[in-house]
Amino acid sequence: MRDNSNNEIRLVIGDVEISGWDNVTADSQVDTPADNWNLTLFRQDGQPLPDSVHGAAKIQLFYNNEVILTSIADQIDEAVSRDGYGLQISGRDLAGQLIDCSVPIFNGRQITLEEMLQRYVLAGDLASVIRDVHIQDNSWLKNKVSVEPSESLWDAIAKAAQVTGQHVWLEPDGSLSIGDPFANPYQVQETLRLIRPLDN
């Protein structure tokens, strides 16, 4: 699938790169964690996927040569019939991993945002999932916040960031950012239309 600027969307999952998608949906809002993404295709001459492509595999979604999403595949569905081969791969952004994890039980319920990130994201089981943490203003991270062991790690991080007057969001490369998402000016590009074929 190519858009009106002749750029292609590619998915890399496992050791396989897949292009030629018929439908691509990737929601992305700063204030909405665990946005959904979904890709589908149908080919008359398609082949079943190798074993390296499976649920819980890491993925990267490319727009031309630019990474626009790093995530983990939640679900992979294949269908084969006499008409051809169908494939659907879907999931959520990496915030979903932080939502699914609860804050571990620890001595003392007051903790700073910096300590929380070091202890539970960069040095915990999620270290292999979250690529890095970028903090715009480190001077505010000394404020402590009350954390309940039962609440999700994402909620705890977001609450601690709000105490410092900052927001939490994920970058396309899978790193976690804390600060003001609109601090740097951005340019609105030409509206993209995904069409197939190009001369449609």
Label each region the model flagged.
Residues R2-S5, I68, Q75-D77, S81-I89, ...:
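Short beta-strand-centered interaction patches in the first periplasmic/extracellular domains
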Residues I9-L11, L39-L41, I59-L61, A73, ...:
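Hydrophobic beta-strand residues in large extracellular and virion-surface proteins
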